[in-house]
Design a protein with these regions (language model features):
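Non-ligating segments of multi-cofactor redox enzymes
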Residues: 1-253, 258-261, 265-287
Length: 287
């Protein structure tokens, strides 16, 4: 029998203990705050590890790291980025293409803790979804952004990009960007479940495309143990990606959809240990 959304993870907590039912969540938060700390170490302590922001930065003032979407906007607008920016975009593209799927979204993005909190509160207080929007709208928005950059000759998305706004706000103090971040929080809390990360964000859409053939993946390797509690579906930002691997015994157990954020919450909250984070070449992930 399916559990209530507000009870998602309770069985896992009772059966596996706190650490094993929160392990991947804790590791993600540590990674997110570690990256943020590398940005903050310069302005706060004068030790520049990551110099810049989430759109473009230098690691130890040497290794460039550039958001691929910003680079595509620059190319679409007719402006060839500097060699260092192109190099940074290549580094990030290769890194996430090899690693897999939307690891940036769940392990690096500073907005992820905000949207996770909104959706935890939504489950906790049994708030019903008040609107429905198609998940493919993020890909439409991605195309619109590139067309808009081509037509205006500007990096049109960077005017309102909440990921870079969040990063700058944390480094330089919250200003008008805080209103946009608050709006996204309320949107996820009151309007559409997992609305930003699961439906709209064009940054996540691009990383999903780039990492669709990457190494790291989630697999329902022991799906025969599934008791249909549905906790994994309740906590997953992209629950549609679990449908075939978990419920269709004729489908491969590997979560192959590029929408998967590889966040590991399905692994955490499953009391029967159905899921594992593995590689796409693992024999268990292919079965």
């Amino acid at each position: 029998m399916a559990n209530r959304k507000r009870d998602a993870g309770r069985e896992a907590l009772e059966k596996k203990g706190w650490w094993r039912s929160h392990r991947w969540l804790v590791l993600r938060r540590l990674c997110q705050f570690f990256v943020l700390g590398m940005f903050l170490s310069g302005p706060w302590f004068g030790v520049w590890i990551l110099h810049g922001n989430y759109s473009s930065s230098l690691l130890f003032d040497t290794v460039p790291l550039t958001d691929p979407l910003m680079t595509l906007q620059s190319l679409a607008s007719g402006h060839l980025p500097a060699t260092v920016a192109l190099t940074g975009a290549v580094i990030i593209t290769v890194l996430y293409a090899l690693a897999g799927k939307r690891l940036f979204c769940s392990w690096v993005c500073p907005l992820n803790p905000i949207t996770d909190l909104a959706n935890w509160l939504r489950r906790r207080f049994d708030l019903n979804q008040s609107a429905t929007i198609p998940r493919h709208i993020r890909y439409v928005l991605l195309v619109v952004i590139l067309l808009g950059s081509a037509l205006t000759g500007t990096l049109i998305w960077e005017w309102i990009n909440p990921v870079s706004l969040m990063g700058r706000s944390l480094v330089m103090g919250f200003g008008s960007g805080a209103l946009l971040i608050l709006a996204l929080f309320l949107f996820d809390l009151l309007v559409v479940e997992h609305g930003w990360c699961g439906h709209i964000c064009p940054v996540g859409a691009l990383y999903g495309v780039l990492g669709s053939k990457g190494v790291i993946t989630v697999a329902a390797t022991d799906r025969q143990k599934c008791n249909r509690c549905m906790d994994c579906f309740h906590v997953c930002p992209e629950p549609h990606v679990l449908r075939a691997p978990v419920l269709d015994e004729q489908s491969p157990v590997q979560v192959s959809s590029r929408d998967c954020m590889t966040c590991g919450r399905c692994v955490d909250v499953c009391s029967e240990d159905v899921f594992t984070i593995t590689t796409r070449w693992s024999s268990g992930a292919k079965s």
